Amino acid sequence: MARIGDGGDLLKCSFCGKSQKQVKKLIAGPGVYICDECIDLCNEIIEEELADADDVKLDELPKPVEIREFLEGYVIGQDTAKRTLAVAVYNHYKRIQAGEKSHDSRCEAVELTKSNILMLGPTGCGKTYLAQTLAKMLNVPFAIADATALTEAGYVGEDVENILLKLIQAADYDVKRAETGIIYIDEVDKIARKSENPSITRDVSGEGVQQALLKILEGTQASVPPQGGRKHPHQEFIQIDTTNVLFIVAGAFAGLEKIIYERVGKRGLGFGAEVRSKAEIDTTDHFAEVMPEDLIKFGLIPEFIGRLPVVASVTNLDKESLVKILSEPKNALVKQYTRLFEMDGVELEFTDDALEAIADQAIHRGTGARGLRAIMEEVLLPVMYDIPSRDDVAKVVVTKETVQDNVLPTIVPRKPSRSERRDKSA
């Protein structure tokens, strides 16, 4: 045991040798002592090693095929969007590695620029989930922002720098790590210019926000208020370089298909309209033929579109895809609710026609995959309320009638054990 002095009553740190009078705190272990200063030093070393381990390394970065296969385990359908995202993300992190490792003049002569991503598609088709799954696989900081809350600087609402604050918070305020993260900006179609022609009045939540986003999308040294909110001159700012931040912006872009139809020679309205059934319209990829001029006509400014060179479109989910979403992914809803019932000692079963009926309702409501959970909650609410208070239920079976006609799920009673039968007969 480490002691100082003739009396042997003055303890000292076993690592740095400082006495208990020279440090704030001395913690005892079996035969050893450690001071608060050595503990702080150990924490710093561990944090540095963890930060180094979390960095995305090129030799460890999954190839586009592997990225797509990983997405397949969580997201059903949207094959074109998966391929586009896989290639774009792989190239983005290759570009970061090339910037860090290029030292000879030949490599430095070629500067690889950033390719941000624009995702188009109806609500509930997996745009946000695709981006979240990507970030999970790559182990990089990931932040989601809502474009509808943003306004031009000086007006009521959020500044665009608050988006960067969310990314810094996701990286535990490690700015270096945040500078290689991913930011997903949703509802970007809601900041479209209110009219195709420039207006005399300021459009502070539309074109003004697009203008404010230009610099951070392209790459700039931004000053971010550490507590969020508006900037004021008496506060410290966090400096972050957005050059290597990958931006994925997404929106439903309702009405864009009519603009595309007009351009390619198909009339969307009137006597010359091409007549198609609703089923055909729902399963058609409206945005496969989108061009920059369509987005400009919709209300995005040319400078904004130019900073989003990669376009990935997602399609409406058909009935077959929704049924697969319910049961096949690793965290499918059926598996989630089955696990919830297992915790109460009850087995849960969905018939095939019940899953099809749930998919039909989601299509009818127009909510896509996002509406599946709401339907499941409605169907299972009565039994989820009663079952925890009962010990005579072995199994719950959800049928087509349960979904369509609000009939209670079939409850299979549990057979009493031998001891329970003996007690009952006694």
Swiss-Prot record:
Keyword terms, alphabetized: ATP-binding, Chaperone, Metal-binding, Nucleotide-binding, Zinc
Domain ClpX-type ZB: 1-54
Any GO molecular function: ATP binding
Gene Ontology cellular-component annotations: HslUV protease complex
InterPro entries: AAA+_ATPase, ATP-dep_Clp_protease_ClpX, ATPase_AAA_core, Clp_ATPase_C, Clp_protease_ATP-bd_su_ClpX, ClpX_bact, P-loop_NTPase, Znf_CppX_C4
Record: residues binding Zn(2+): C13, C16, C35, C38
Residues binding ATP: P122, T123, G124, C125, G126, K127, T128, Y129
GO BP term, pick one: proteolysis involved in protein catabolic process
SMART domains per record: AAA (SM00382), ClpB_D2-small (SM01086), zf-C4_ClpX (SM00994)
Gene3D superfamilies, alphabetized: 1.10.8.60, ClpX chaperone, C4-type zinc finger domain (6.20.220.10), P-loop containing nucleotide triphosphate hydrolases (3.40.50.300)
Quaternary structure and partners: Component of the ClpX-ClpP complex. Forms a hexameric ring that, in the presence of ATP, binds to fourteen ClpP subunits assembled into a disk-like structure with a central cavity, resembling the structure of eukaryotic proteasomes.
Function: ATP-dependent specificity component of the Clp protease. It directs the protease to specific substrates. Can perform chaperone functions in the absence of ClpP.
Alphabetical list of PANTHER family matching this protein: ATP-DEPENDENT CLP PROTEASE ATP-BINDING SUBUNIT CLPX-LIKE, MITOCHONDRIAL, ATP-DEPENDENT CLP PROTEASE ATP-BINDING SUBUNIT CLPX-LIKE, MITOCHONDRIAL-RELATED
Family that this chain belongs to: Belongs to the ClpX chaperone family.
Protein name (database record): ATP-dependent Clp protease ATP-binding subunit ClpX
Record organism: Mycobacterium ulcerans (strain Agy99)
Gene that specifies this protein: clpX
